[in-house]
Amino acid sequence: MTDTRKSPEPGVKLRAADKVARIPVKIAPTEKPLRKPAWIRARTHGSPEVQRLKRVLREQRLHTVCEEASCPNLGECFGHGTATFMIMGDICTRRCPFCDVAHGRPEPLDAEEPENLARTIAAMGLRYVVITSVDRDDLRDGGARHFVDCIRTTRAHSPDIRIEILVPDFRGRMDVALAILNEAPPDVFNHNLETVPRLYREARPGSDYDWSLDLIQRFKETHPQVPTKSGLMLGLGEEMHEVEAVMRDLRDHGCDMLTLGQYLQPSLHHLPVKRYVTPEEFDRLAEIGYAMGFSQVASGPMVRSSYHADQQAQKVIPEG
């Protein structure tokens, strides 16, 4: 039967059931979610500092992945005056069923965003910032030029800042994207594999495991002095031997830093949590990671790719 549903108008956000309606592996709403164990905790989001930072972001028309992806650490990070900025809008062209960012047809890029971002970062007095983005498959360069504009403008306003970028996979656009990023390389290059290859069709429709590994390797070959980073979420049904295999693949492709955290289901329409990985298992994976040669491993139930990113980078980036 032909699917006659129309694509949403630009700017219309699809979430939950609407977002995952057309992915290859269908997801039935979760009826009985697993009970969260005692080690899964997150602070509330109602502190004055959290509310102040949210106001600043709205005034500057900026977005954070902390809010859009419903990160459980939002209260802690915002409470310390730090955030991971999400550029190029808050609508993603992908439909990954683990992610709470909305799907749809994005609006055109905001030409004022690099300046607004740079001024906000300078006003906050940040010394380390993470800049990430939604997937923009509608752009010929995947958004690489906008990343470079944001990096350059931020450095112009804050010359001593360290910038980590958490990039999409630039599907079908790797050559042009990497060529553009060469103009203003970040201080840390991060691209998340998210899960083991067996679960890609279900968890990362539209993405390719080997493509993502190649992206990390090619950036590292061009910029050997820039630390590379990737992350996995656990609890989607992967086996530990598969996780270790991915870790080995990352090392073989030049990845220096690793984050491992527990997947938490954003809504009943997202992928269910199959298992809560214990803190002891996360500690063991960290030991394995260091034995493999990773220079920095952050592994724990509440760890996220950008969580305490400044502290993760301290051991890797030499003081300038």
From Swiss-Prot:
Signal peptide: none annotated. Binds 2 [4Fe-4S] clusters per subunit. One cluster is coordinated with 3 cysteines and an exchangeable S-adenosyl-L-methionine. GO terms for cellular component: cytoplasm. Pathway: Protein modification; protein lipoylation via endogenous pathway; protein N(6)-(lipoyl)lysine from octanoyl-[acyl-carrier-protein]: step 2/2. Residues 77-295 form the Radical SAM core domain. It holds the Pfam family Radical_SAM. It catalyses: [[Fe-S] cluster scaffold protein carrying a second [4Fe-4S](2+) cluster] + N(6)-octanoyl-L-lysyl-[protein] + 2 oxidized [2Fe-2S]-[ferredoxin] + 2 S-adenosyl-L-methionine + 4 H(+) = [[Fe-S] cluster scaffold protein] + N(6)-[(R)-dihydrolipoyl]-L-lysyl-[protein] + 4 Fe(3+) + 2 hydrogen sulfide + 2 5'-deoxyadenosine + 2 L-methionine + 2 reduced [2Fe-2S]-[ferredoxin]. Gene3D superfamilies: Aldolase class I (3.20.20.70). [4Fe-4S] cluster 2 binds at C92, C96, C99. Its main location: cytoplasm. Transmembrane segments: none annotated. It is found in: Cytoplasm. It comes from the Bacteria. Keywords: 4Fe-4S, Cytoplasm, Iron, Iron-sulfur, Metal-binding, S-adenosyl-L-methionine, Transferase. Its cofactor is [4Fe-4S] cluster. Its EC number is 2.8.1.8. SUPFAM superfamilies: Radical SAM enzymes. One of its GO terms (molecular function) is 4 iron, 4 sulfur cluster binding. [4Fe-4S] cluster 1 binds at C66, C71, C77, S306. Belongs to the radical SAM superfamily. Lipoyl synthase family. PANTHER family: LIPOYL SYNTHASE, LIPOYL SYNTHASE, MITOCHONDRIAL. This is Lipoyl synthase.
